[in-house]
């Protein structure tokens, strides 16, 4: 999904606002689920400027509801001073069936729910793409790097010959 920024303001109207690139390297993603995100006004503005970080974020359960923990959305600098905690838990909007499915996956050994990206849909709503993931060990990570390098070398050889 490509970022589309509105003219002079440089704000993201729809498209990817933040991405967790390290999650796809550290985990094997089994399935993905899209969830809504409850945000305050300044948090939305900060996201539209593309200033969020998901590298240390994770999703978990609290009181029967799913929350996004440790996602860094900094304070919006261009407006009225409104104090909020940049790493506060943010509620995820999911149906009960989806929550039960995710919690069932978490109960399995070694699986976790990680946020893969925050994006704005065509209607301008903030959404989080969650992945049900299984941790990788060092050997798996090395194999992924070797495979990626081989694909790059193969493409380079084909360009040179072809």
From Swiss-Prot:
Gene Ontology molecular-function annotations: RNA binding
GO cellular component: cytosol
Record's keyword terms, sorted: Cytoplasm, RNA-binding
A single GO BP: trans-translation
Protein's cellular compartments: Cytoplasm
One Pfam family named in its UniProt record: SmpB
Superkingdom per UniProt: Bacteria
SUPFAM superfamilies according to UniProt: Small protein B (SmpB)
CDD domains associated with the record: SmpB
Family as reported in the entry's similarity comment: Belongs to the SmpB family.
UniProt-listed HAMAP family: SmpB
Described function: Required for rescue of stalled ribosomes mediated by trans-translation. Binds to transfer-messenger RNA (tmRNA), required for stable association of tmRNA with ribosomes. tmRNA and SmpB together mimic tRNA shape, replacing the anticodon stem-loop with SmpB. tmRNA is encoded by the ssrA gene; the 2 termini fold to resemble tRNA(Ala) and it encodes a 'tag peptide', a short internal open reading frame. During trans-translation Ala-aminoacylated tmRNA acts like a tRNA, entering the A-site of stalled ribosomes, displacing the stalled mRNA.
Protein name per its UniProtKB record: SsrA-binding protein
Species of provenance: Granulibacter bethesdensis (strain ATCC BAA-1260 / CGDNIH1)
